[in-house]
């Protein structure tokens, strides 16, 4: 009887922890820290479902690679700020960097100061060719990157991709999770399209992750969009929110919506 009671208690605690994590993600997604403009894109980016799929919990150390202006950071930081840690592996900048990169990093760091919305968050640097120490080795429970792999491939090819996934593997604890969301190129498409379209083949990303030592644990269709053919005049930027063709066929591309995206969960072996 005592053993049964212990099992029931353990199961109850497990369910409670799951609900607590879900509630933390939901609360963060609906928080006032996020602008209404940011929340409007939840229709396409599905942050709550995506982060639950990856297994985000409040006590985790989470590294977000290339967080940009902080669309996902608003949610991630809010979830882990009390019990865990948020690390932003932002752009690497030096004297030769563009003003955009410099301003982006400076603006993000300003938000980590006392009294600001990411107070206490850590900012590191990432570049697939110049800066690979995104966090202390073996310190992260989770590494996440959203719609960035195509940039590294277009800028640095296979070497850049291998360096990136190697850096993610190094930063994670054994058993840690790598979550990747990326614009998906059909497997039947010419591989050359990855060089300029902004879309990547799922098989290519899985192979790159496995080469670094990861195991594919699961995939999700939560960010899939079957209306997106991935064949557009200006690549993925033809679609919203960019709408690179501006008024040309605007209604057509708005009707398609944002891109079809793969959502992949990898694990670093124990």
Q: Model-derived features: where do they sit?
A:
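S-adenosyl-L-methionine
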Residues: 100-132
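C-terminal lobe and adjacent flexible extensions of AdoMet/dcAdoMet transferase-like proteins
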Residues: 249-270
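Conserved beta-strand signature within the Rossmann-like core of class I S-adenosyl-L-methionine
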Residues: 87-89, 175-183
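A short acidic, Gly/Pro-enriched loop at the edge of an enzyme's catalytic core
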Residues: 132-144
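Conserved class I S-adenosyl-L-methionine
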Residues: 59-68
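Conserved Class I S-adenosyl-L-methionine
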Residues: 191-219
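A short glycine-rich, Lys/Arg-flanked "PGG" loop and its adjoining helix->strand segment in the class I
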Residues: 77-78, 159-174
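Class I SAM-dependent methyltransferase Rossmann-like catalytic core
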Residues: 25-58
